[in-house]
């Protein structure tokens, strides 16, 4: 099997399939990134790219066409805010995200039934409920690693998190005390960051540089250091970084693989099944190409 995109979805898919005995080739256009390669320059990162960015793709050779509200097309580079990109890396955006791990509330699955559908709104009911998805939330929380508090009335998890909540600092303690005086229930933010040593990696060092950068002590949990690592450890998964999926291959009306450019050469990858996990823009591009 071949998976295009080694982010949150593709990384987990690689682990599930490899653990089930399937042979998996996991592709990503980006590289393996760590703190040494992403740095912590607040003028050069994926959110503020005034002087370039730190997550790829390269600024030259990776244009996108952005259409503004007037219908005018603009060719933009990866460091433009109109590029609408998170990160090109093994692990995708999970390398540089803030790591909040909220579940949707049960009402989020019934927005139209709860609030109606005003003209121009996008409120819809999901075809599934919170209870349908809850077991998969739990699997993901334990696979990737979430630190959080006990269940609350607003978010009744069926099982606790694998790690305790992070300790509140002074500002958090002040806010919690004020909320309690007002009779408001509070809960700790569930975070995909180690509050204690976990999975062979260190606990959070409280550097407060999570968003936009890799973790200096590898305490932030993304697919690159959890699901993908475990997929590789099964012996059934290979990872090709810096591999650009150009188009789908077809035979007799069926998808049979991907055409991929890597290390200066074109490769025709044949597979029994193809998983597209390239994000909203790149997945759509592949399907339309």
Where are these regions (language model features)?
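N-terminal glycine-rich phosphate/pyrophosphate-binding loop and immediately adjacent elements
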Residues: 1-117, 122, 127-131, 135-138, ...
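Short, glycine/acidic-rich beta->alpha junctions
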Residues: 6-9, 167, 171, 219-223, ...
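A broad, structural surface signal
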Residues: 15, 19, 29, 131-142, ...
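Glycine-rich loop(s) and the adjacent beta-strand/alpha-helix scaffold that form part
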Residues: 16-19, 23-46, 234, 243, ...
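Rossmann-like flavin
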Residues: 88-201
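Hydrophobic alpha-helical scaffolding
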Residues: 123-126, 164-166, 214-221, 276-277
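Helical element adjacent to the flavin cofactor pocket in flavoenzyme catalytic cores
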Residues: 174-180, 201-272
């Amino acid at each position: 099997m071949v998976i295009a995109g080694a982010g949150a979805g593709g990384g987990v898919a690689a682990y599930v399939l490899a653990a089930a005995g399937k042979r998996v080739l996991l592709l990503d256009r980006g590289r393996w990134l760590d703190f040494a390669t992403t740095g912590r320059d607040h003028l050069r990162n994926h959110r503020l790219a005034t002087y370039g960015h730190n997550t790829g793709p390269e600024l030259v050779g990776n244009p996108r066409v952005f259409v503004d509200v007037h219908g005018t097309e603009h060719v933009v580079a990866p460091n433009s805010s109109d590029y609408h990109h998170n990160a090109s890396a093994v692990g995708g955006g999970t390398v540089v995200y803030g790591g909040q791990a909220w579940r949707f509330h049960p009402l989020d699955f019934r927005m139209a039934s709860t609030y109606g559908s005003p003209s121009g709104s996008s409120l819809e009911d999901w075809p599934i409920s919170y209870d349908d998805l809850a077991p998969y939330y739990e699997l993901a929380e334990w696979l990737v690693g979430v630190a959080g508090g006990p269940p609350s009335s607003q978010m009744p998890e069926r099982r606790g998190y694998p790690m305790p909540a992070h300790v509140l600092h002074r500002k958090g303690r002040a806010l919690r005390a004020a909320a309690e005086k007002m009779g408001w229930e509070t809960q700790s933010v569930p975070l995909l960051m180690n509050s204690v040593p976990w999975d062979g990696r260190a606990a959070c060092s409280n550097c407060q540089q999570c968003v936009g950068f890799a973790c200096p002590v590898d305490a932030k949990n993304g697919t690159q250091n959890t699901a993908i690592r475990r997929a590789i450890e099964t012996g059934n998964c290979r990872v090709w970084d810096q591999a650009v999926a150009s188009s789908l291959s077809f035979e007799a009306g069926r998808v049979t693989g991907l055409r991929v450019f890597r290390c200066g050469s074109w490769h025709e990858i044949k597979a029994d099944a193809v998983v597209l996990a390239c994000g909203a823009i790149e997945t759509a591009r592949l399907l339309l190409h």
